[in-house]
Swiss-Prot record:
Keywords, ordered alphabetically: Repeat, Secreted, Signal
GO terms for biological process, alphabetical: coagulation; negative regulation of flagellated sperm motility; sperm capacitation
Residue ranges with Basic and acidic residues bias: 292-310, 335-345
Name under which the protein is recorded: Semenogelin-2
Species, as recorded: Pan troglodytes (Chimpanzee)
GO cellular component: extracellular region
Subcellular localization: Secreted
Length: 407
């Protein structure tokens, strides 16, 4: 408690001394003439200490009226010099920002040149915006994750007072085919590609914008024609014997175009074309044969129900095409179609579990399950190199199995 009371009293004394000194300083400004040279100039250096040092000096009682007058003049001069220094620093900062902008512009141009050399056939997006006669060009290549994503997405938005035009840029050969891993995982799936390109144009360049629009339309039409031709080749590569009864994946091309037309003073046109193409690069073939049930009547009113569930050959063929190169497929004929009657006849005679009772009123149930061959053929073509087809026939039951008779 005593320490707190002493601290409060010391603060009160300091505040009273400061109030007295400030009152004396205000009263002395009108009394002192311009003869400030009566006091030594060595005292001028003391005003460079902070306000804290001044308060500390005032608390000791060593602060004089004349010294306060010198401090006021020097503070005014120092304030003027500080403002001038701040202006110089601001000017230097402005020059530094301009220098950084110029360096960034050069780096962007260099990056654009390198990316243009490396990205032939890739998607690349150019963002140009003009402000005050200076153009900042940036080039970005969308990342193509060939393991997880079907295509890359590039998106850039720059906002300024000029016009924005969006369109779909040229499709490359790399986009025509995804990676082998992605195709192996998704059979018969669709592959879509979205490329969004933003370009901010100067208002006076109407002819250049119109020319670019026509070029984009022509290139887009060529891409659609190439995709249709590619899909047609894939359809012709299927085997005629299985083509009528196989369930194919999506091979059609679905193209959607959303055009947003925005007109400004010079009637520039803003286009946004979104393209969603589903490529028919895979053929997924599954053939089934229906099960049949035959009932036989044996001697003396006996009934024998023979169920012959013959599952036909399941032929799964996957054809993968990369870089527009196609390879014809060899389709394996189903054994149940070619030799259906023989297999059924043999399965009736040599079924696995057959029960026959020749007595009157007894029933015999014959059940035979014969599974056909399962043929899986996978053909992968990567960069013009094809792999040989693998054919794995598997039969669940032998035809020469003995009959088990239970009386």
């Amino acid at each position: 408690m005593k320490s707190i009371i002493l601290f409060v009293l010391s603060l009160v004394l300091i505040l009273e001394k400061q109030a007295a000194v400030m009152g004396q300083k205000d009263g002395s400004k009108g009394q002192l003439p311009s003869g400030s040279s009566q006091f030594p100039h060595g005292q001028k250096g003391q005003h460079y200490f902070g306000q804290k040092d001044q308060q500390h000096t005032k608390s000791k009682g060593s602060f004089s009226i004349q010294h306060t007058y010198h401090v006021d003049i020097n503070d005014h001069d120092q304030t003027r010099k500080s403002q001038q220094y701040d202006l110089n620093a601001l000017h230097k900062v402005t020059k530094s920002k301009q220098h950084l902008d110029g360096s960034q512009q050069l780096l962007n141009y260099k990056q654009e040149g390198r990316d243009h050399d490396k990205s032939e056939g890739h998607f690349h997006m150019i963002v140009i915006h003009h402000k005050g006669g200076q153009a900042h060009c940036g080039t970005q290549n969308p990342s193509q994750d060939q393991g997880n994503s079907p295509s890359g997405k590039g998106l850039s938005s720059q906002y300024s007072n000029t016009e924005k035009r969006l369109w779909v840029h040229g499709l490359s050969k790399e986009q025509a085919s995804a990676s082998g891993a992605q195709k192996g995982r998704t059979q018969g799936g669709s592959q879509s590609s979205y490329v969004l390109q933003t370009e901010e144009l100067v208002v006076n360049k109407q002819q250049l914008e119109t020319k670019n629009s026509h070029q984009n339309k022509g290139h887009y039409q060529n891409v659609v024609d190439v995709r249709e031709e590619h899909s047609g080749k894939l359809q012709t590569s299927l085997h005629p014997a299985h083509q009528d009864r196989l369930q194919h994946g999506p091979k059609d091309i679905f193209t959607t175009q959303d055009e947003l037309l925005v007109y400004n003073k010079n009637q520039h046109q803003t286009k946004n074309l979104n393209q969603d193409q589903e490529h028919g690069q895979k053929a997924h073939k599954i053939s089934y044969q229906s099960s049949r049930t035959e009932e036989r009547q044996l001697n003396h009113g006996e009934k024998s129900v023979q169920k012959d569930v013959s599952k036909g050959s399941i032929s799964i063929q996957t054809e993968e095409k990369i870089h527009g190169k196609s390879q014809n497929q060899v389709t394996i004929h189903s054994q149940d179609q070619e030799h259906g009657h023989k297999e059924n006849k043999m399965s009736y005679q040599s079924s696995s579990t057959e029960e026959r009772h020749l007595n009157c009123g007894e029933k015999g149930i014959q059940k035979g399950v014969s599974k056909g061959s399962i043929s899986i053929q996978t053909e992968e073509q990567i960069h013009g190199k094809s792999q040989n087809x693998v054919r794995i026939p598997s039969q669940a039951q032998e035809y020469g199995r003995k009959e088990n008779k239970i009386s």
